[in-house]
Amino acid sequence: IWPRDWSSDVCSSDLIFSLFVERSSGISFLIGACMSSAGCVIGMKSATYANVRTTNKARESLSIGETVKVALCGGSISGLGVQAFGMLGFIGVLLIWNGISPDATGHGLLANLECNPSIMRITTYSLGCSIVAMFNRVAGGNYTKAADISADILAKIRHDMPEDDSRVRNVIADFIGDNVNDIAGNCSDLLESFVATMAASVMIAVTIYNGAPSIGEGTLNATVIFP
């Protein structure tokens, strides 16, 4: 799912969280990174197949409505997949460690920094999604811009060859960069925002419960489940 340099960065961050923050937070961080990466991979593959099917539908039917329908169905795969993977990882983190414990305390394997394990697991899960979004934006943006500029320069040198001519090899690289930046980058950004919103609501619910325990755990669970 990740290139080699991404894997080393993610694994080192995972180890740091487990050693110095909270012993199980590294696992939740890795779950978040895997969920975000899986959503990006499915989004890119579905977009690639949808491009071919949309073009073929337009050639066969010559109907704008039928062509747009195929394009929207292909785009909905990544949109629904982002929400599905975000919820899957979030619910998985809650189920693996038996939900939310507002009054629990924990620490890392080496450091004695006390924290709430439930909150820290949710936070690091969101951070795992965010770090993949950053990698996709940076790598996809650089790749896209390099291919785009090189294709523009070649089109200016060769006046008989337009920028998007299939004979220009940089066009394929430009399309790949657009796929990574526009599909994987947007998918990971959306998933990161979606998960961060849920994590923030959980932290607010735990803070309210710790400030006023009289509201009961039923209200806490309802507040956590609502988002």
Question: Which residues make up each language-model segment?
Answer:
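Alpha-helical transmembrane segments and their lipid-water interface positions
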Residues: 40-47, 82, 86-90, 140, ...
